[in-house]
């Protein structure tokens, strides 16, 4: 069965449409650091407004542990959404209580309201299906139909993602549809050469995708904190750099499999090593197999790929027709250790085929480093969801919408 889309819901004029967005943006002291996920939701929300729907937006923000917490309120998000839509957006101070019911009741055709953070209710993320279903039914009372458009949460079995889609006539929004279209191009006969760039802190988070993609890619470039587990698997010492000892044997297996398949796993030849985790820490570029030979010795921290590696990665990326990147190459938040990530990002903007930035920290990195979204083929809104899709895992939030 194919994914159900909004067209399957019929005429939406005057109908209450609950839209599950992923508006989980970085927020500090009420200030939004990156509104990319809000902007990504605009296509679906604008289409529903133009169709005369009464739009009820729901989302989570952060991890408030199932209780109300002002620092995780969606109020600033609702205000920013209104600015981007160029329309008044109402805000309800609760999710399923009196404020939510009154705000939904007051909606006219084409109006929008944002309900308060779903995760102020522990039922949203409960492991108990019955508890989740009860919360979903409370949400369902506020709508006539349901549109799922939070791609970043479709890999989670949560009340607003899974059970709510069963409680009301449901369909996927345009954001989810576009995400799937791009990810399909990465898994179904991708144009070659096909390169995958993986970074980020933990190799354990990427093992599934490495295993699933090895038979499908031409080159796999490894950076970020995870590279040190690969270096250790090759017999090199890595100082005090991030290391997952329990994954070393698994990584050895992947290195052997890649060699058998003729897939290039490209590891850094040089790294930036510092004597502390701060922007003003003393640091230098050293060979990847000589990390403990720096003045910091066994206390040295590898915090970025080196310039030789960054240039080598960029050459491979620019020569590829399909590129998927997930995870920064270093601690890009600290200026001395941002160069590797910036070089890789710039190379992706020069790919003549399909370049995909895989959400999460990668999306935050390219924006923080000054790159406009439209310089890339696609910036995914789902870090974990896109990885699980590429692993070939079943995603409950898609299956409940008819996806197979």
UniProtKB/Swiss-Prot annotation:
InterPro entries for the chain: Phosphoglycerate_kinase, Phosphoglycerate_kinase_CS, Phosphoglycerate_kinase_N, Phosphoglycerate_kinase_sf
A GO molecular-function descriptor: ADP binding
Enzyme Commission (EC) number: 2.7.2.3
Keyword Ion transport attached: no
Gene Ontology, cellular component aspect: cytosol
UniProt family annotation: Belongs to the phosphoglycerate kinase family.
Name the record gives this protein: Phosphoglycerate kinase
Gene that specifies this protein: pgk
């Amino acid at each position: 069965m194919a994914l159900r889309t909004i067209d399957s819901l019929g005429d939406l004029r005057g109908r209450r449409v609950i839209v599950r967005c992923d508006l989980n943006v970085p927020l500090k002291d009420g200030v939004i650091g990156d509104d990319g996920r809000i902007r990504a939701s605009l296509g679906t929300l604008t289409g529903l407004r133009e169709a005369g729907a009464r739009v009820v937006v729901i989302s989570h923000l952060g991890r408030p542990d199932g209780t109300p917490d002002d620092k995780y309120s969606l109020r600033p998000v609702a205000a920013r959404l209104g600015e981007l839509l160029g329309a008044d957006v109402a805000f309800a101070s609760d999710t399923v209580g009196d404020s939510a019911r009154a705000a939904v009741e007051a909606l006219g055709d084409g109006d929008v309201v944002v309900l308060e953070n779903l995760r102020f209710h522990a039922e949203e993320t409960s492991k108990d299906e019955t508890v989740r279903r009860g919360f979903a039914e409370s949400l369902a009372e506020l709508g006539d139909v349901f549109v799922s458009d939070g791609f970043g949460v479709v890999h989670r079995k949560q009340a607003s993602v899974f059970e709510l889609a069963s409680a009301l006539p449901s369909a996927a929004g345009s954001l989810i549809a576009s995400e799937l279209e791009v990810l399909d191009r990465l898994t179904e006969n991708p144009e070659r050469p096909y390169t995958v760039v993986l970074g980020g802190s933990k190799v354990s988070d990427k093992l599934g995708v490495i295993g699933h993609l090895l038979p499908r890619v031409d080159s796999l470039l490894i950076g970020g904190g995870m590279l040190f587990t690969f270096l250790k698997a090759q017999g090199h010492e890595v100082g005090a750099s991030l290391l997952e000892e329990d994954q070393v044997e698994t990584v050895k297996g992947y290195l052997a499999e890649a060699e058998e398949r003729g897939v290039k796993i490209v590891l850094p030849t040089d790294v930036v090593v510092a004597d502390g985790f701060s922007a003003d820490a003393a640091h230098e570029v050293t060979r990847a197999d000589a990390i403990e030979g720096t003045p910091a010795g066994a206390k040295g921290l590898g915090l970025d790929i080196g310039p030789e590696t960054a240039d080598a990665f960029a050459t491979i990326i620019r020569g590829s027709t399909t590129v998927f990147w997930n995870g920064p190459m270093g601690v890009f938040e600290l200026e001395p250790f941002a160069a590797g990530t910036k070089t890789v990002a710039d190379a992706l903007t020069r790919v003549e085929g399909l370049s995909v930035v895989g959400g999460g920290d990668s999306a935050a990195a390219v924006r923080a480093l000054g790159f406009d979204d439209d310089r890339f083929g696609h910036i995914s809104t789902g870090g974990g969801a896109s990885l699980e899709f590429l692993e070939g895992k079943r995603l409950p939030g898609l299956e409940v919408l008819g996806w197979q």
